[in-house]
């Protein structure tokens, strides 16, 4: 599943590539991809004549702020756009990704949503396993209330609210493993299996440790490790092990730099001991028994 760095990579690509993109036509190739409104016709009508004004990210969700455009001959850059048209929210889930196409390329087998501007440039959403979802939240409704998972997210790892004091507060009485805690999106948004493993390795903390046993200095180190690992991955365009692609169709390169994730049986880059794998909270967990205590 695309995690924070992959979703942030997509967000940056969308923001750069879709500057001044006004939706003229929407084609829904798979109805189940549209999570809200329940009728695809309302989803299509809601998006038409909307400017993809600004792209944000919250955890693993992409959120596009929409502006209603009535005049096709509007001139850019736009200084004042007063008529909001709600939000387009996207969750890529396991295998979803976007591709920008500036010609009449036929849709591939796994194309789920097609969005066109008046020049017939296309933003294509492709999803092999079809778990990804999209929501059009009309003006006046709150995305946090419509989308349960969005409203329950914990703080962003890069935010001021995510520090050792916050971590100490949320884990002080928890018997769960620190790995399971990091995967909990209500505690911290955007971290998945890859970056939980890599962050714990960087911090020298065993993924099996009960969260409540982590000391203050370790929490400080863990917070810094999380931020540094995420930044490094974003700088590498995220991680591709199977389906993830950026807007240009390129793979992420962080997978070549991982220290423990998917390196079972290989030598630890620090100590030379072999990397091990075991399941925690139903997820494959990779760690170095010598470097992580």
From Swiss-Prot:
SUPFAM superfamilies: Glucocorticoid receptor-like (DNA-binding domain), N-terminal domain of MutM-like DNA repair proteins, S13-like H2TH domain. DNA binds at residues 110, 129, 174. One of its GO terms (molecular function) is damaged DNA binding. Keywords: DNA damage, DNA repair, DNA-binding, Glycosidase, Hydrolase, Lyase, Metal-binding, Multifunctional enzyme, Zinc, Zinc-finger. SMART domains: Fapy_DNA_glyco, H2TH. It catalyses: Hydrolysis of DNA containing ring-opened 7-methylguanine residues, releasing 2,6-diamino-4-hydroxy-5-(N-methyl)formamidopyrimidine; 2'-deoxyribonucleotide-(2'-deoxyribose 5'-phosphate)-2'-deoxyribonucleotide-DNA = a 3'-end 2'-deoxyribonucleotide-(2,3-dehydro-2,3-deoxyribose 5'-phosphate)-DNA + a 5'-end 5'-phospho-2'-deoxyribonucleoside-DNA + H(+). The active site is at residues 2-3, 60, 283. The keyword Hydrolase applies. Its EC number is 3.2.2.23, 4.2.99.18. It holds the Pfam family H2TH. GO terms for biological process: base-excision repair. Binds 1 zinc ion per subunit. PROSITE patterns: FPG_CAT, ZF_FPG_1, ZF_FPG_2. A zinc finger (FPG-type) spans 259-293. Its cofactor is Zn(2+). PANTHER family: FORMAMIDOPYRIMIDINE-DNA GLYCOSYLASE (PTHR22993:SF9). Involved in base excision repair of DNA damaged by oxidation or by mutagenic agents. Acts as a DNA glycosylase that recognizes and removes damaged bases. Has a preference for oxidized purines, such as 7,8-dihydro-8-oxoguanine (8-oxoG). Has AP (apurinic/apyrimidinic) lyase activity and introduces nicks in the DNA strand. Cleaves the DNA backbone by beta-delta elimination to generate a single-strand break at the site of the removed base with both 3'- and 5'-phosphates. Belongs to the FPG family. Monomer. This is Formamidopyrimidine-DNA glycosylase. It comes from Prochlorococcus marinus (strain MIT 9312). The gene is mutM.
